């Protein structure tokens, strides 16, 4: 291949460990070093090394970050007040957590962190081996692991294997929830507890009803799930569908319409993957912000509506003890100050929190009757744990506003408190958005290449290539 630049210009930038290794330079790949794994499109062994090393980095982060959180854990404070995002995920699996969402032991978290660190070392070694010492391509030495991007049957077989692995992962959660100690259920009586999910929902009308719901208003799409039976039942269905679909793709060849409809190249597969990850990222952002079943508020802090309703409830409890008649007191607008009716006639909390009248949360549900909040329960059956939890949630809204939002004063929170819901929602949203941009970019390039026209910028026309070296 014709040299497009002065080699001397780049000597200080890159000194290859072994210049004979494939995928190292622009002459052998057509891509410069900053193009990353594009250099490895046609060297499957080196691409395997890159992916294994990347997996090692991810596992290392998980292990190191869990140990970091464990080392900073303060038992007297809730996890959502300590800037954690990983301990909560382990706690929801039933590890180290007791009634009311109290962290009872950090030993399981320490063990998980160490296991991840050890695993990352193994993956890291595998990544280095395949990047530097292993065969450049797998097709000759290990035909089962080798592939050609244009081999449609092989590509769908690889897809099938991935689907089967995802299905197995889904069933691991099901097994943990049903047989291996259970999972944390925020809806358990008395404020949440670890329990076995003995009767998961298997009714397809219920499970797939979430998928076909509207994402707007009170419908909430899949994010509206509000009980552990549906969550575990959903994982059973997902696991079954993934494994059945995986077996299908392993043992069949793509139909003619699929061969015509899709672009079959490495960059096309990358774009498909980026689109899938983007969708998962957006879904995770919505879940972490709105859902208080998969993301229990005892661990992640209240949702925005939950904090607002908590404040209304806290002031209702206070003023009722001071002698206020909470069922008839009027606010400055003439509407109910503490209680009022929703558009559908339910009794709801009054004041600015009325906008969140359809909130469902474990601490308030015991106070409801057949027509919204039960006046008799409000006056005679409020439990201390409900008061404590509402008072705590009231001051920990996941809001960064400098003024009142939904009736919740947030100026203090904007200074010294950031909810894990804010972190998780914003990070997943922005990452998902940029993954979507990546999907558009790579899908456009893949389609252009398949159509036979421009593949990137012609480097031969870059002015810098005709300039003399700096030194």
Curated annotation (Swiss-Prot):
Localisation per UniProt entry: Plastid, Chloroplast thylakoid membrane
GO process terms (BP): photosynthetic electron transport in photosystem II
Record's bilayer topology term: Multi-pass membrane protein
GO molecular function: chlorophyll binding; electron transporter, transferring electrons within the cyclic electron transport pathway of photosynthesis activity; metal ion binding
Pfam families named in the record: PSII
Phosphothreonine: residues carrying this PTM: 15
InterPro entries xref list: PS_antenna-like, PS_II_antenna-like_sf, PSII_PsbC, PSII_PsbC_sf
Record keywords, A-Z: Acetylation, Chlorophyll, Chloroplast, Chromophore, Manganese, Membrane, Metal-binding, Phosphoprotein, Photosynthesis, Photosystem II, Plastid, Thylakoid, Transmembrane, Transmembrane helix
Residues that make up the propeptide removed upon maturation: 1-14
GO cellular component terms, A-Z: chloroplast thylakoid membrane; photosystem II
List of residues binding [CaMn4O5] cluster: 365
Main location: plastid
TM region(s), chain numbering: 67-91, 132-153, 176-198, 253-273, 289-310, 445-469
Manner of cofactor binding, per the entry note: Binds multiple chlorophylls and provides some of the ligands for the Ca-4Mn-5O cluster of the oxygen-evolving complex. It may also provide a ligand for a Cl- that is required for oxygen evolution. PSII binds additional chlorophylls, carotenoids and specific lipids.
Top-level taxon: Eukaryota
Entry-annotated residues carrying N-acetylthreonine: 15
Purpose of the protein: One of the components of the core complex of photosystem II (PSII). It binds chlorophyll and helps catalyze the primary light-induced photochemical processes of PSII. PSII is a light-driven water:plastoquinone oxidoreductase, using light energy to abstract electrons from H(2)O, generating O(2) and a proton gradient subsequently used for ATP formation.
Family: Belongs to the PsbB/PsbC family. PsbC subfamily.
Full protein name: Photosystem II CP43 reaction center protein
This protein's encoding gene: psbC
């Amino acid at each position: 291949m014709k040299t497009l630049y002065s080699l001397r210009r780049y000597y200080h930038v890159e000194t290859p460990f072994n210049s004979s290794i494939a995928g190292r330079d622009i002459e052998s790949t057509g891509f410069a070093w900053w193009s990353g794994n594009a250099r490895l499109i046609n060297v499957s062994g080196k691409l395997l090394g890159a992916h294994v090393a990347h997996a090692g980095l991810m596992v290392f982060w998980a292990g190191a970050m869990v140990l970091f959180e464990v080392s900073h854990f303060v038992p007297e404070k809730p996890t959502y007040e300590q800037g954690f995002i990983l301990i909560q995920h382990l706690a929801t699996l039933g590890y180290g957590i007791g009634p009311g969402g109290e962290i009872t032991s950090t030993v399981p978290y320490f063990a998980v962190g160490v296991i991840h660190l050890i695993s990352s070392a193994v993956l890291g070694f595998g990544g280095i081996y395949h990047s530097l010492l292993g065969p450049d391509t797998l097709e000759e030495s290990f035909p089962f692991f080798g592939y050609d991007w244009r081999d449609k049957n092989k590509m769908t077989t690889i897809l099938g294997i991935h689907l089967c692995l995802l299905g197995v992962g889904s069933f691991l959660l099901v097994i943990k929830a049903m047989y291996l100690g259970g999972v944390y259920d925020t809806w358990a009586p008395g404020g949440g507890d670890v329990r076995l999910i003995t009767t998961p929902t298997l009714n397809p009308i219920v499970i797939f009803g979430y998928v076909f719901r509207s994402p707007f208003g009170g419908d909430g799409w899949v994010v509206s799930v509000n009980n552990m039976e549906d969550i575990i039942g959903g994982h059973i269905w997902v696991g079954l569908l993934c494994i059945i679909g995986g077996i299908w793709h392993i043992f069949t060849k793509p139909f003619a319409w699929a061969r015509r409809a899709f672009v079959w190249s490495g960059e096309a597969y990358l774009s498909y993957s980026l689109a899938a990850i983007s969708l998962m990222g957006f879904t995770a952002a919505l879940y972490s912000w709105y859902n208080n079943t998969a993301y229990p508020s005892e661990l992640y802090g209240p949702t925005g509506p939950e904090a607002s309703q908590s404040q209304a409830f806290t002031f209702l409890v206070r003023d009722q003890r001071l002698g206020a008649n909470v069922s008839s007191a009027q606010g400055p607008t003439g509407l109910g100050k503490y209680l009022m009716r929703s558009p559908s006639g339910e009794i709801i909390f009054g004041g600015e929190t009325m906008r969140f009248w359809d909130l469902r949360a474990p601490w308030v549900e015991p106070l409801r009757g057949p027509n919204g909040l039960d006046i008799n329960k409000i006056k005679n059956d409020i439990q201390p744990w409900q008061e404590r939890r509402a008072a705590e949630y009231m001051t920990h809204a996941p809001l960064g506003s400098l003024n009142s939002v939904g009736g919740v004063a947030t100026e203090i929170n904007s200074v010294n408190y950031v909810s894990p819901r804010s972190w998780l929602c914003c990070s997943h949203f922005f990452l998902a958005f940029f993954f979507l941009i990546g999907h558009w970019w790579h899908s456009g390039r893949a389609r252009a290449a398949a159509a036979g026209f421009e593949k990137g910028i012609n480097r031969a026309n870059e002015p810098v290539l005709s300039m003399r070296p700096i030194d």
